Amino acid sequence: MSNKPIADMIETIEHFAQTQPSYPVYNVLGQEHTYGDLKADSDSLAAVIDQLGLPEKSPVVVFGGQEYEMLATFVALTKSGHAYIPIDSHSALERVSAILEVAEPSLIIAISAFPLEQVSTPMINLAQVQEAFAQGNNYEITHPVKGDDNYYIIFTSGTTGKPKGVQISHDNLLSFTNWMITDKEFATPSRPQMLAQPPYSFDLSVMYWAPTLALGGTLFTLPSVITQDFKQLFAAIFSLPIAIWTSTPSFADMAMLSEYFNSEKMPGITHFYFDGEELTVKTAQKLRERFPNARIINAYGPTEATVALSAVAVTDEMLATLKRLPIGYTKADSPTFIIDEEGNKLPNGEQGEIIVSGPAVSKGYMKNPEKTAEAFFEFEGLPAYHTGDVGTMTDEGLLLYGGRMDFQIKFNGYRIELEDVSQNLNKSRFIESAVAVPRYNKDHKVQNLLAYVILKDGVREQFERDIDITKAIKEDLTDIMMSYMMPSKFLYRDSLPLTPNGKIDIKGLINEVNKR
């Protein structure tokens, strides 16, 4: 039986609270909370929020990790007509204060201890939230978030300048959710049993909670204290009865460090959903060997177009024949185009910027008309967004990814994709992980390419000097990389800096190299 689209997220959650009140919606390492609990707790908290007399539709910050109270608070806020701004409890203090400065929330709900002391915004802490749950207040839903109202606001991790708050409406969310639960590429089962690992402040989290709540399934969450400790992580993962794994490819790479991460130990896993960064052929091949019968979905899209706009099930033929995986068939309600530098549509097969339009495109950045005007526009009568990604559309309707426009450089007359260089470096038998970074001269021209490299275990001991390692890597890659793409300098590190979302912070490294 195929899944039906939903008309309203809260009505759908209410429906499951009536039809399957004792079915688990949230499982934190074995501690279960049911759909009945979620309704009762969110109703009771929504009643308390209404009594506070906050300005209508004003946004509320919710600070915490993967606790059940986070989800119940989100639902309570949606019922009471407020957008929520999730901030992960592991966020840097500067980031937290920068978000508060931009958002000016009417309330902070701190499920984890709030790290800033001097805050003028009213605050509710975990004990008060639990007290509100215990009151068991009834609640009549009269003014929920609906239509073009903001459902959530997620701040992207800008490495420089102030963070940008992407406003996602209820309509935007429905466009994404209904595509995901009805699309044949995802093939999402009803009552999905879903891993809930990415933090709520990262919009990849919407890829697990939205379809799960829309289809009456269960979220299995891993607190971040566990995901950051290999031993605990592996012990916990094997105990979770999950069928769908949703994460960045990097998190799957981390899981594959354990030889036990395979279909024999985890026979329940039937689907892998990837988004948030590029899924490489190497990672997908390794995963296919470990889970030969699982469906591996490569999805793509910016936060500004609600999580993802395209997806494809990776085939064995793709793994055998392609150097780079396609990023998917685009969703029907979101016309996606490739345009040239003048803004003209390009025919299939030609490379340009990926433009997405339609009902999933955000209304823009919160209180930032300048940045909104730069990125958002109207295209053929529909709201549209400049992704800043380079792509090509095939005649079959498959989108191919060509890297970030801001990670494209001109060097000695050649146009070079930094991501291409990084991918090729990662093919060396000596390299665990590597990224390429340009160094600019005073005329803003690329002077040379540098490689930041993490070596595989045991490699350093095989060589006397770094220069010998570099020579061996270059020889190793002679047949793979064009000479003009080969970095002139290799810097060896034990780790590479990550953004708050767990991606390698390439912009930060570029700034470091160029002392910006």
Curated annotation (Swiss-Prot):
GO CC terms: cytoplasm
Enzyme class: ligase
Residue positions binding D-alanine: D203, V307, K503
Keywords: ATP-binding, Cytoplasm, Ligase, Nucleotide-binding
Catalytic activity: holo-[D-alanyl-carrier protein] + D-alanine + ATP = D-alanyl-[D-alanyl-carrier protein] + AMP + diphosphate
Pathway named in the protein's UniProt entry: Cell wall biogenesis; lipoteichoic acid biosynthesis
InterPro entries: AA_adenyl_dom (IPR010071), AMP-bd_C (IPR025110), AMP-bd_C_sf (IPR045851), AMP-binding_CS (IPR020845), AMP-dep_synth/lig_dom (IPR000873), ANL_N_sf (IPR042099), DltA (IPR010072), DltA-like (IPR044507)
Biological processes, Gene Ontology terms: lipoteichoic acid biosynthetic process
Enzyme Commission designation: 6.2.1.54
Record-stated family: Belongs to the ATP-dependent AMP-binding enzyme family. DltA subfamily.
Task performed by this protein: Catalyzes the first step in the D-alanylation of lipoteichoic acid (LTA), the activation of D-alanine and its transfer onto the D-alanyl carrier protein (Dcp) DltC. In an ATP-dependent two-step reaction, forms a high energy D-alanyl-AMP intermediate, followed by transfer of the D-alanyl residue as a thiol ester to the phosphopantheinyl prosthetic group of the Dcp. D-alanylation of LTA plays an important role in modulating the properties of the cell wall in Gram-positive bacteria, influencing the net charge of the cell wall.
The name this protein goes by in its record: D-alanine--D-alanyl carrier protein ligase
Naturally occurring in which organism (per UniProt): Streptococcus pneumoniae (strain ATCC 700669 / Spain 23F-1)
